[in-house]
Amino acid sequence: ITLEAKGNEQQVNLDKLTVAALEGETELKALLDWQQAISWRGELTLNGINTAKEFPEWPSKLNGLIKTRGSLYGGTWQMEVPELKLTGNVKQNKVNVDGTLKGNSYMQWMIPGLHLELGPNSAEVKGELGVKDLNLDATINAPGLDNALPGLGGTAKGLVKVRGTVEAPQLLADITARGLRWQELSVAQVRVEGDIKSTDQIAGKLDVRVEQISQPDVNINLVTLNAKGSEKQHELQLRIQGEPVSGQLNLAGSFDRKEERWKGTLSNTRFQTPVGPWSLTRDIALDYRNKEQKISIGPHCWLNPNAELCVPQT
């Protein structure tokens, strides 16, 4: 380790901090100033980093450069990464990260381009979440996730778009994944489609379909979630087929933004469980008052071939 630095009561200037490790070298140059706001400027360089000996199950060879600057003042912050480059390989998978971005505590972001690549898999983010306008795209194209991370497998492809304005944002999503595996969990297919807008009230639709969820003692053939409508009138349907639990429910409701009150009805609800089938004998009325942090649940009964469980209004 070698260190070259100087400073005073107002700032510290780190001319060079060099750490020789992992068969390579890491070098940091930085300036930290606190005269008025806390501000920083830094440059981190990775040269010939090799983790094969220390982490044989996760061998990596990396080179890179990360430049950053920013400030923190009065509970607000801003930061910029004018240069981000990382190259090399991880477990024989090529690694490439390249991009620039800047943002602040008001969640305003400008991303001219951020590209991530691991083997045949890639993801890209580009656009801005501005003071007024929103125009951001995020894409993923991962045809070969097998062993990209230990225990991971499958494919994924999708697109997320943010459009509109800060006053009336719109979110569109279309994502598909197949043959997903993580350790002992496997999922044959996942599909997510959504189009959500927010103007004077939130409205849109969301469809989620998940097929063949498997792990020890769990085998779910199909899960579907469908939601649509607006704040004033919306509905949701959930269906589950599999073991040890299967079933369905419908939820319909309306939200009064002025009163901060949501009223709804839970209906068409039944489940098959290890202790037999259970079903509602009547719809359940639900009433949530956000100002009072209070929820009321109407009286209802759950029916089983061998029992009936009734709950008074709560």
Q: Which residue stretches match the model-derived regions?
A:
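Interface amphipathic segments
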Residues: 1-314
